Amino acid sequence: GKKIMPGTFNGTTLTISATPVDHALIPDEGATNVAGIAIVGSDMYCVKTTGLKTTLLKTTDYMATKATAVRKDLNWFALGLTKIGNYLYMLAEDHKGYGGSTTIVKLDTKGNQLGTYSINEICPKGALGITAADGTNEKFIIMHYADKNNAGTLTFSVVDWKAAEAASTFTVTNSGFGYTTQLQ
C-alpha cells in the first residue's frame, strides 16, 4: 500500500515527522557529500560528490550491506537525485558551487548519461533540490534560491523536461529552512 507520513497542519505550518525503518552504510569513495537518494524498485541509489567528482552508489539490501559504487566518474557537482520509472535524474552543476550551469542529468541505473537539460534560465542563482512531480512523466519540482543572500526565501518551480520555462512557480518566504538541500 501507499505509505503516509504522519504530520500536522495548523493553518500556516505543515510539520511532518518520520521514523527511519531501513538504512545502509554509504562508503566514502573519495566523495564527502551525499547529494541525493532515490529508490528504483527495491534498489536504493545515491550520489555522493566532492567538487566535480561524483559517484553513483547502489544497495539492494539496506540492512545487511553497504552501498557499492556503480559509477565513479560522473563529472558533475551533484545537488540532488530523483527517479522516474527506471531512470535517475541528477540535479547538478558543471562546476563546484551553485548557479551558472544548473542542469538535470538523465542517467540509467548503471550511471550512463542519457541526456541533459539546462535549467539555468529557470534558476540562475542555483538550485538546491529536485523531486519527480508525478512519477511517470518527465516533470520535476525544483527547489532553488530566490536570492542567495536570503536562504530563508526559496522558490519552487514545476519544470517539464526540455521546456523553455517553468510551468509554474511559487515562493516561500521566511521559511526558516536555512540551507535546506532535500526535497521529496
PLM features: residue spans?
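Conserved beta-propeller blade signature
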Residues: 43-46, 88-90, 139-143
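Blade-level signature of beta-propeller repeat domains, shared across WD40, Kelch, NHL, RCC1
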Residues: 151-160, 177-184
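Short loop/turn segments that connect beta-strands within beta-propeller blades
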Residues: 8-12, 60-64, 108-112, 160-165
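A short beta-strand motif characteristic of beta-propeller blades
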Residues: 17-28, 66-72, 113-120, 167-179
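Short glycine/acidic-enriched loop and turn motifs that connect beta-strands
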Residues: 1, 50-53, 94-99, 145-151
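A short loop-to-beta-strand structural motif that recurs across blades of beta-propeller domains
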Residues: 2-5, 55-58, 101-105, 152-157
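Repeated scaffold domains used in trafficking and secretory/extracellular systems
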Residues: 28-39, 74-84, 121-133, 177-184
